[in-house]
């Protein structure tokens, strides 16, 4: 147990160091390598409200700031096309990419005009699974990933997501209604919340199997230097021994046995 905790600490420290970004002197990307496939990642860093556990690059949504940002994204896409880059796959992450649905659609349409795009992937939140948005995303996005995190109302309240995105039951119903609009609808979940019990974890797995999604991704709750204090105030202190135990429970329920709910990919 002690050796595992030490290894976890070392790996997390190395990851933090590796992922620290520094300015580069170049003012343009290197030219594309002929014959090499490329994927375009588009980051939309805006959220309507910021979750206390999230350590990704994100900012509170302001309409004009977001529109200026999307315009800059599209200009950079034109620069990439002029430089000779081509992309068959586009992934839009955040933040909340659907925070300004019309700007997102315009950006995706431009990507398809500039490049030979075969597939677009995007993230979203449950409150954007509404007919108006789904109609606009249908055909533009093939694979949608919905940040659910948990169907448990108690955990949703702790995460400050209950009022923003609805109850677990409401989210469950929205996923079922949204799934037919996409080739693949993924549900993003988090495990190892300090107050999460095995019963809550198992209940989340059962709801995933029944909600109509095509796949699911479970990630352990990640604590960064930027979020540690806020997370401990709001959610409590993390237990990495429980994280390991919960991982094995998830692996057995979702991908183990003779009739697994999902095919294990990673």
What kind of feature is each model-predicted range?
Residues 1-40, 48-49:
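Flexible, acidic/Gly-rich N-terminal and inter-domain linker regions that tether
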Residues 42-58:
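Local cysteine-cluster metal-coordination motifs and their immediate loop/turn environment
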Residues 34, 41, 249-253:
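Short, charged low-complexity linear motifs
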Residues 58-83, 88-250:
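Conserved non-cysteine loop/helix-boundary elements of the Radical SAM core domain that shape
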Residues 39, 52, 93:
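Divalent metal-dependent hydrolysis catalytic cores, especially in the metallo-beta-lactamase
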Residues 250-266:
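C-terminal accessory regions of radical SAM enzymes
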Residues 40-42, 146:
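Short beta-strand motif preference
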């Amino acid at each position: 147990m002690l050796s595992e905790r030490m290894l976890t600490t070392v790996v997390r420290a190395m990851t933090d160091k590796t992922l620290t970004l520094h300015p580069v002197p170049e003012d343009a990307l290197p030219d594309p390598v002929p014959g090499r496939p490329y994927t375009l990642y588009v980051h939309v860093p805006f959220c309507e409200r910021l979750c206390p556990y999230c350590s990704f690059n994100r900012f509170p949504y302001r309409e004009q700031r977001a529109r200026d940002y999307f315009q800059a994204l599209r200009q950079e896409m034109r620069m990439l096309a002029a430089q000779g880059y081509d992309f068959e796959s586009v992934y839009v992450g955040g933040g909340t990419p659907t925070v300004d649905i019309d700007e997102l659609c315009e950006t995706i349409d431009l990507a398809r005009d500039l490049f030979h795009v075969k597939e677009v992937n995007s993230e979203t939140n449950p409150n954007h699974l509404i007919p108006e948005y789904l109609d606009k995303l249908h055909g533009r996005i093939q694979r949608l990933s919905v940040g659910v995190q948990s169907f448990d109302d108690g955990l949703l309240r702790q995460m400050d997501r209950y009022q923003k995105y609805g109850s677990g039951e409401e989210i469950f119903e929205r996923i079922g209604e949204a799934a037919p609009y996409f080739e693949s609808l993924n549900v993003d979940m988090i495990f190892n919340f300090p107050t999460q019990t095995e019963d809550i974890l198992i209940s989340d797995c059962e709801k995933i199997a029944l909600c109509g999604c095509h796949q699911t991704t479970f990630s352990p709750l990640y604590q960064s230097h930027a979020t540690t204090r806020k997370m401990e105030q709001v959610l409590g202190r993390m237990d990495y021994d429980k994280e390991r135990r919960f991982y094995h429970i998830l692996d057995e329920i979702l991908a183990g046995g003779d009739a697994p709910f999902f095919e294990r990919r990673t």
